[in-house]
């Protein structure tokens, strides 16, 4: 699959435990974004984008509303952001973003996930420079030239448009997120985005094959089992 697919997360959690973690992560992130930038989505574009993504991932409305109400009340928990970088199985590059009320606990849990799965935790900036923060949209389609023309006519800055397996991926600077979405939805009102997100896109991919594949899957699962982990980005290209 293309780069966008390599970094997208499952849009629906499959088990009750995964759903609980998904709801908790969205609730925490919505609370932090609303507390920092305001509780009205029209005036807080980061909150608006986050709510749209939560709805697409089928997060219940009451989870979203409770997080916003909590932010309205002031006080509450204070969360710090924490980012960890390093190399995973097969020497792939990994970025782990966290929201935590206890940095020491989070570091310990993330480090254990690295240590137990043939991965190496690096220092800040170890691999971050090899990823670009980008707006990524993925939707059904075959005609990449038509999509590129739509975006050019709307004066949208685009990094890449690619087609693979009947899906079009649009990658643009993260600052162009709403311009891309508006241009596409205006031109194609019935468009259905499978992915619409701001994420870290790797500049190069690292093949992961053989025995490293199972270790890599275990490594990612261990990271995502950490309650404070919000997102995991990597450049692994799994070789079947």
From Swiss-Prot:
It is found in: Cytoplasm. HAMAP family: Transcrip_reg_TACO1. NCBIfam families: PRK12378.1 (NF009044). One of its GO terms (molecular function) is DNA binding. Pfam families: TACO1_YebC_N, Transcrip_reg. Belongs to the TACO1 family. Keywords: Cytoplasm, DNA-binding, Transcription, Transcription regulation. It comes from the Bacteria. This is Probable transcriptional regulatory protein SO_3401. It comes from Shewanella oneidensis (strain ATCC 700550 / JCM 31522 / CIP 106686 / LMG 19005 / NCIMB 14063 / MR-1). Coiled coil: none annotated. GO terms for cellular component: cytosol. One of its GO terms (biological process) is regulation of DNA-templated transcription.
